Regions:
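Glycine- (often His-adjacent) and acidic-residue-rich active-site loop
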Residues: 9, 47, 65-104, 117, ...
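C-terminal alpha-helix plus adjacent terminal tail
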Residues: 1-24, 55, 70, 174-180, ...
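Residue-level signature of the cytosolic catalytic core of signaling kinases
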Residues: 37, 91-94, 151, 193, ...
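Hydrophobic alpha-helical membrane-association signature
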Residues: 41-44, 94, 197, 238
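Conserved CoA-thioester-binding segment of acyl-CoA-metabolizing enzymes
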Residues: 1-66, 100
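Crotonase-fold acyl-CoA enzyme core
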Residues: 100-216, 243, 247-248, 252-256, ...
């Protein structure tokens, strides 16, 4: 209702919250790094959708990135710090909580994607209910190019959206596609010229905000039942495989070669 006190998101460092009526916009924010996911953002992503669910001042959530990027995926410097310090990569419990809290959010969540949505960035966008992308946006899940498994949800959501054959090709090559091509093959709902993206998302969010909220929410919840069951059947294994590959020589070589701007020399990795 109008005037309700919303959840205070000011304590978040890597996610910025803004409000427009009953629409809550969450913007990934890692300035200078194309909103890459570092330890702080990963931790915050594991709880921000729970806070959004509890927010009484919003009915619709928009997920986007600050500036000209949605998210470039995992921060390679964070990965390098991980293997140099002997840790096994991102926290597995956090990784699972990100996916499940997205799926458990009853409010419709709309992705607004400009620029790159890569790796976990793509996963976040694709688990949203409706995805708007700039025609020039880029989607990819190049975990394999970092020597790791696409375990954070990509192996779940890509096949559901575009079928197993296409999804496996993109997951085992890491190849990128444009927003226009993503819409053509059904990976996203809508691709629009970049200068029309904000207005398109605002209009759609306002349309949902003016609808029957209980009916909208429970229709979404019902549609998500099968997807949640699938996620529960896959995510433990896929995250586990990813954690294993964070310890490999191939992963270390992938990260170092990228930071050193050279071609990686992979071993067999098994």
């Amino acid at each position: 209702m109008a005037g309700e006190q919303g959840v205070d998101f000011s304590g978040y460092e890597r996610i910025k919250a803004t409000r427009r009526g009953r629409v809550l916009t969450l913007s990934l924010s890692n300035p200078g790094k194309l909103n890459a996911v570092d330890a702080a953002m990963h931790r915050e992503l594991s709880r921000v959708f729970l806070d959004a669910a509890d927010d009484p001042a919003s009915d619709i959530v928009v997920l986007t990135g600050e500036g000209a990027s949605f998210s470039a995926g995992g921060d390679l410097n964070w990965m390098k710090q991980g293997f140099e310090s002997g840790t096994k990569g991102p926290d597995a419990a956090e990784a699972k909580r990100i996916v499940f809290s997205l799926l458990d959010l009853e409010k419709p969540i709309v992705a607004k994607v400009a620029g790159p949505a890569i790796g976990l960035g793509a996963t976040l966008a694709l688990f949203c209910d409706v995805i708007f992308a700039a025609e020039s946006a880029r989607f990819a899940d190049p975990h394999v190019r970092a020597g790791i498994v696409a375990g954070d949800g990509g192996a779940i959501i890509w096949p559901q959206l575009i079928g197993y054959a296409r999804a496996k090709e993109y997951l085992i090559t890491g190849d990128a596609i444009s927003g226009a091509e993503a819409a053509r093959i059904g990976l996203v709902n809508h691709a629009v010229p970049e200068d029309e993206l904000d207005a398109s998302v605002d209009a759609f969010a306002d349309r949902l905000a003016g609808g029957a909220q209980m009916a909208i929410r429970y229709s979404k919840v019902s549609a998500n039942i099968g997807l949640k069951q699938l996620a529960h059947s896959i995510l433990d294994a896929s995250v586990g495989y990813e954690m294993v590959t964070f310890t490999t020589d191939d992963h270390r070589e992938a990260v170092r070669s990228f930071l050193e701007k050279r071609t990686p020399k992979f071993g067999r990795g098994i």
